[in-house]
Amino acid sequence: SKIGLLGHSQGGVVASMTAGILASRGESPDALVLIAPGSVIQDACMGGRFFGAEFNPADPPEYVKCFGIMKLGREYILTTQELDIYGTAKAYTGPVRLIHGSKDTIVPMYCSEKFIETYTQDAELITVEGENHMITRKLKTVVSHAVSFFASQLI
C-alpha cells in the first residue's frame, strides 16, 4: 500500500521533516503535499517576533502570547530556532505538490519557494489566486489540488 503525507502551515513543516526522516530510514512516503508550509516560524523565533509577540530570542520567557490567544512556550521557541527544516526535508526525493494562496499574509510565498528549491526533483508549486492562509476563500480548489495529486501518485 502507498502512503501520502499532507500538512498545512506548521503541519507542513512537520510533514516535510517527517518525509525526510522516513526517507533517510528507507521508509519514504510515496507523495507529499504541503499547503503554505510555515517555515517562517523559524525566522520568527530567531528574530524574537512571533505574530504579535516580542521577546528576546536568546532568552525567551516561559511563554509568549501570539495572535492574542495562542501561547507558545520557551522550549518551543528554543527548539524551533535549532531545527534544520530544509536540510531534514531534502532527504525526501519523491513527488511533492506545494499549494499556497496568493493573499497569504501569515506565511510568505518565499517559504513555498524555498521548499521548491529544496526538492530539486519532482516538485511543483500551485498558487491559488486570492486565497489566504486559513483557506477560507477557495477551499474546494485547494482540496481538489491535493486530492488530484494524491490520486495521481497513490492510486
Range-by-range predicted roles:
Residues 2-4, 20, 26-127, 131-152:
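The alpha/beta-hydrolase serine catalytic core
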